[in-house]
Design a protein with these regions (language model features):
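Glycine-aromatic micro-motifs
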Residues: 1-141
Length: 141
């Protein structure tokens, strides 16, 4: 695993998710994004593709990460991008925990924190996802 910084991109929560909330997307319209880069097996990539929805909301793009090289990333398909999308608070918290665990700088974390969020209206899902957040926190992230 490695981390890097890619110029000219920005992080948004404007990919329409199946649950109606905004999910992460990178878009070539910003000052830059911090990235975590993993080397995974082909079998694990197939599993990740299914989880992330490759071909059903996300496609792939190559990001050129300085000192690392070209890396595959998911990017929202244009028909799934809705600038009015707002992410759920638990989802944004998971993104922040991951960004913090990877040592991304405070100004980047604050930029993520500044993005709008809303409470998940599905009580059962909300409680389940916040339990996930607490498990991640308990794991030291």
């Amino acid at each position: 695993m490695a981390t890097g910084f890619v110029l000219d991109w920005s992080l948004h929560f404007h990919k329409r998710g199946k649950d109606g909330s905004g999910k992460c997307n990178i878009f070539p319209d910003g000052d830059g994004i911090h990235v975590a880069v993993y080397d995974i097996s082909a079998a694990d990539k197939l599993v990740l593709d299914k989880i992330e929805g490759l071909g059903s909301g996300y496609s792939e793009t190559l990001l050129s990460v300085p000192d690392i090289g070209d890396c595959v990333s998911y990017i929202a398909e244009e028909s799934y991008v809705e600038d009015s999308s707002i992410t759920y608070d638990w989802y944004k918290e998971l993104v922040l925990l991951g960004a913090s665990a990877h040592g991304f700088p405070d100004d980047y974390l604050n930029r993520i924190r500044s993005l709008p969020q809303r409470q998940d209206p599905d009580t059962a899902r909300r409680l389940k996802r916040w339990k996930t957040v607490e498990l991640v926190r308990a794991g030291g992230y």
